[in-house]
């Protein structure tokens, strides 16, 4: 049974940061426990245990070979480092960092219209977002750089939309993140990225909700490039 993330403390995060600085956030790197122990001022056994804990927590992928091991950060590992980064920004009063995602407008499967309009969600949108969203989502296919940057979104403070159930089925929770949608000189400020816990979309796709139909207010068509900006909570 894998260890829970509670097994990951500051020492393990220091090891995670080191392998990320060595390039493990973008591709697998080869490292020995003796090399890691020198950098962390710990014994080889301690360094090995820290990597094992990171792997058990889902922060690292490891492949042990005869002369070392190949390691790479998982999405959860990247998210953990982004959270550390965001906390340091809060400590030092730097809330200027903006997460910027770019992609192209695309047509969805129409599921957003159905789910957004359900009363169990709509009531929470009105209370927690401060508006009643247009029944549908704006779908964006992220470019390669933004797909990698997207992990930073989960380190921001989101607005929780709770799951609920009716007589027939249960509906999953979601998290909303305040965002600005930018197209040339036009901007839609009252918008949110919505990240459902249950979704058919992968990490390359983004869903946005807003009070108005963004395709109309920004005169959007499929294939247009668009930018989404998110800021840390002030």
UniProtKB/Swiss-Prot annotation:
Recorded name of the encoding gene: ribK
Signal peptide range: none
Protein's organism: Haloquadratum walsbyi (strain DSM 16790 / HBSQ001)
Gene3D superfamilies recorded: Riboflavin kinase-like, Winged helix-like DNA-binding domain superfamily/Winged helix DNA-binding domain
Binding site for CDP: 108-113, 212-215
EC number: 2.7.1.161
Region (Riboflavin kinase): 99-234
Catalytic activity: riboflavin + CTP = CDP + FMN + H(+)
Residues annotated to bind FMN: 199, 207
Lineage, opening ranks: Archaea, Methanobacteriati, Methanobacteriota, Stenosarchaea group, Halobacteria
Ligand binding (Mg(2+)): 137, 139
GO molecular function terms noted in the UniProt entry: DNA-binding transcription factor activity; magnesium ion binding; nucleotide binding; riboflavin kinase activity
Protein known as: Riboflavin kinase
Pathway: Cofactor biosynthesis; FMN biosynthesis; FMN from riboflavin (CTP route): step 1/1
Keywords associated with the record: Flavoprotein, FMN, Kinase, Magnesium, Metal-binding, Nucleotide-binding, Transferase
Stated family: Belongs to the archaeal riboflavin kinase family.
């Amino acid at each position: 049974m894998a260890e829970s993330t509670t097994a990951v403390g500051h020492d393990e995060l220091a090891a995670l940061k080191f392998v990320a600085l060595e390039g493990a956030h973008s591709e697998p790197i080869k490292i020995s426990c003796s090399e890691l122990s020198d950098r962390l001022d710990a014994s080889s056994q301690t360094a090995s245990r820290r990597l094992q804990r990171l792997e058990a927590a889902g922060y690292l992928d490891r492949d042990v070979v005869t002369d070392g091991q190949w390691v790479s950060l998982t999405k959860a590992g990247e998210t953990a480092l982004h959270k550390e980064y965001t906390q340091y920004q809060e400590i030092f009063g730097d809330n200027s960092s903006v997460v910027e995602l770019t992609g192209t407008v695309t047509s969805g499967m129409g599921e957003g219209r159905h789910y957004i309009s359900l009363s169990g969600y709509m009531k929470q949108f009105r209370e927690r977002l401060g508006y009643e969203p247009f029944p549908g989502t704006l779908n964006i296919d992220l470019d390669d750089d933004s797909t990698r940057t997207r992990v930073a979104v989960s380190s921001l403070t989101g607005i929780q939309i709770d799951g609920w159930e009716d007589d027939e089925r249960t509906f999953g929770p979601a998290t909303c993140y305040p965002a600005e949608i930018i197209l040339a000189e036009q901007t839609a400020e009252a918008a949110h990225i919505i990240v459902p816990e249950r979704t058919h979309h992968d990490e390359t796709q983004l869903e946005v909700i807003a009070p108005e139909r963004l395709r109309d207010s920004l005169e959007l068509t499929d294939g247009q490039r668009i930018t989404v900006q998110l800021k840390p909570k002030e």
